[in-house]
Regions:
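An acidic, Gly/Ser/Thr/Pro-rich helix-cap/linker signature
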Residues: 1-46, 174-181
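Substrate-binding/active-site groove segments that recognize
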Residues: 69-90, 102-109
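Solvent-exposed loop/turn segments at secondary-structure junctions
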Residues: 59-62, 80-81, 130-133, 169
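Short, solvent-exposed loop/turn and secondary-structure capping segments
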Residues: 64-69, 136-139
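C-terminal amphipathic alpha-helical segment
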Residues: 160-189
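Catalytic and binding regions of secreted/periplasmic enzymes and modules that target cell-wall glycans
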Residues: 109-139
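Short, functionally critical alpha-helical segments immediately adjacent to catalytic or ligand/cofactor-binding
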Residues: 47-62, 123-128
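Solvent-exposed, acidic/flexible segments
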Residues: 24-35, 44-47, 66-74, 94-102, ...
Length: 189
């Protein structure tokens, strides 16, 4: 289901292997037991368990992360948050409630998976760049192969970064990587 290796992924495997970013994010997730909860929610929505690690890339599991246009562990923009049931107002912002936001992330990822025919590379690119952007690019370039699409830099690098991060986390920190994962998944990897 997931591409395991290519030059774009390997480039980021080198980056993530030579710094402590993945370890620090997994430590934060482990100490707060975020992954246990996220895995349960994603299992309920029948999502690939690897997607539970998306917050490493989005926010390093920082529930208060703020990039200026997106907030929370899942880095939702205001419009996406509201589309998926989160309240965003002056006095309260559900994007910062990681439990509520996790359910919204699961619904959004499920919808992206359906929209892109369970091609999770395209779905992840849609999570980053927006599903309409991805559909325009696929139509104009005549391909549904993520690896052949020419995309803006952030989206072009998003999926290889995610897959590299998964590889480093699984191989270097398995005890944290598999925390809360379904047994069938942990035993088959």
């Amino acid at each position: 289901m997931w591409k395991q290796s290519n030059p774009r992924i390997n480039k980021f495997v080198q980056v993530y292997s030579n710094n402590n970013h993945v370890k620090n994010c997994l430590n934060r997730a482990s100490s707060k037991r975020y992954l246990n909860y996220i895995h349960r929610v994603f299992y309920k929505y029948k999502l690939p368990p690897e997607l539970a690690h998306l917050p490493i890339l989005e926010s390093c599991f920082d529930t208060k992360a703020d990039s200026g246009h997106a907030r929370g562990m899942w880095q939702f923009t205001r419009s996406t948050a509201e589309d998926y049931g989160l309240s965003v107002g002056f006095f309260s912002d559900d994007r910062l409630n990681w439990r509520k936001a996790t359910h919204s992330a699961a619904r959004y990822l499920k919808k992206l998976g359906e929209r892109f025919n369970r091609n999770w590379e395209l779905a992840l690119a849609g999570y980053n760049g927006g599903p309409s952007y991805m559909e325009r690019q696929m139509k104009s370039q005549g391909t549904r192969n993520f690896w052949k699409l020419k995309l803006r830099k952030e989206t072009h690098e998003y999926v290889p970064k995610f897959l590299a991060m998964l590889k480093v986390a699984r191989n270097k920190f398995p005890e944290m990587y598999f925390q809360g994962a379904p047994r069938s998944w942990a035993s088959s990897s």
